[in-house]
Amino acid sequence: MCEALVSYIQRWSEGHLAALPDNLMRSQLPLTLFQSLIRTLHTQNQDGSWGSSNSAEETAYAILILKSVACFSFTEMIAAQVETAISKGLEFILTRSQRSPTDDQLWLDKTLYAIPTVSDSYIMAAVQAEETIHKLAEIPYKLVNMSTVTVHKMTEYFSQLPSQMQTPKWVIQASAIEAILLSDRLKTLDVFSTGRPLGEKYIKMAACFWTLANNSDPECLLSTRNIYTMAELSIGLFQEDDLMERSLAGLPDSAIPVIADYIDKLSHATNLCRDPSLHQCLDGDNTPPDMDEEGLTRVKAIRQNIDLWFRFVSDENLTRNTSSSDRLDLQQEVKMATLAATQRARANRALSNGNGHSTTEHITVLSDQNFYTWLHTSAVHDVKSAVVSKALICKIGNGGDVFITAKEKYLAERLWRQMSVEGRLWNDVGSIERDRLASNLNSVNFPEFSSPQSLKLDGDVRTQLLQLAEYEQKYTLSCLNDLTQILDNSGRRTISLYLQMYYRCCVIYNETCAKYAFGSTTAM
């Protein structure tokens, strides 16, 4: 397939063949060929072979792939890795003195077969095939605009994260390139049709959270479709968060219960995307009688945006392979996250109005909740980490519940909550100053952090928050290990690996929040 696609692109570039539709030429083809390259590179064994049985024939397949798509290396670092991999593969083949009885027995569907003449043909082809890396070096750039400056900046950015210190630099660089290729489609995402999609630089970074987490361990790679939809959801979350924050900021407190009631009704509705009559019953007016025309218009717009958000997250393409209970679980999480946004709007308004004890550094919020209660209730849902968690479960489901027993379901829910708690803390570590300037509620606004005892014994507010984030991180790992051990012991290693990949994605995001104060205004 790789040889055929590269041959087609070459003939097209010479004017001998017509172009395919633009989305295939500019997005799908380069992404497919680049992924073929890096995933083949990533799965080579230490002895230079490929596959679990050290097969010369399977190694020949891999060498043929690398030789045909080497021109899609994009950088000198990856090109050097390709050349080394090909050299090691050829050395493995050429230094074998004899064929063992099981050397080249390969599975084809449900059949174990071995045809020595066919095997020898592939091996000879791999040895003699011409490398395309120099001959076709300009071909990829006729399809995509790959800025090597951006690639190198992203590589340096992510290689400085604690979790990536041991990751080979070429893997980080390959993940950055893969994210850039994915962003060609992601940059058009505008969930609420505001005409204000996120900046391309931010989108590339958000996509790289997923590609880097996926590529960091090649044992079980999430499909391109799933990686794309999860990156799409992550970007959609930032659009929703920004829009809801701006939309709710100017509403009077009397309008918040109206929005909350609509969210509650919407979450209990069935066949949301397919039943137009549903919206008639949801449009029942319970707005305060004293609300002016402008307020009514804003409430209506917020309702419409909430409707769009529920549709986006619960789209059939996202959840068609999941069980009804996992789908319901996701919908309920979206409800709780959206309700939490209304509570945050009230808290932010209180901060903006100076409703608290002000110092030169920050305002200490006046609240009927202590910090722990707030963090483990509304803040857990407001961070929306569990929405992403449960959307991923819907993506990897295969018709039945992903988690089967009561214990598994309990541990999974505990893990989502724990990851949300930890994520909120890391997010607040990196956004103390940004939140202060924007009058957004941050963990350090709670009085526990500014008490004389806390400041004296545990350090400034950022240091205190950092200590709590590190404390919660230990319990997240404990929850993850408990759940993955059960999955491993019950023959569901693939699900276990997907969860570990997702946790790596969260760690990468948390580290960027703490180290770089990452946000939707991040530029590179």
Region annotations inferred by a language model:
Residues M1-Q35, T43-E91, T95-E138, E156-V313, ...:
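An alpha-helical repeat/solenoid feature that recognizes helix-turn-helix modules
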Residues R11-L20, V69-I78, E316-D326, I393-K409, ...:
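Inter-helical turn/loop segments and adjacent helix faces that build the functional surface
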Residues A18-L20, F34-T43, E58-Y61, I65, ...:
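Active/binding-pocket-proximal capping segment
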Residues L64-I65, M146-S159, I259, R414-Q418, ...:
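Eukaryote-specific, cytoplasm-facing alpha-helical/coiled-coil scaffolding segments in long proteins
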Residues T84-T102, L106-Y113, Q453-Y475, L480-G491:
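Extended charged low-complexity segments that act as oligomerization/scaffolding linkers
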Residues E293-E422, W426-E433, L499-T512:
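All-alpha helical catalytic cores of prenyl diphosphate-utilizing isoprenoid enzymes
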Residues F371-A379, K407-R417, I432-L483:
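Divalent-cation-assisted or electrostatically stabilized phosphate/pyrophosphate-binding catalytic cores
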Residues R462-L468, L487-M524:
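Acidic, carboxylate-rich catalytic segments that either coordinate divalent cations
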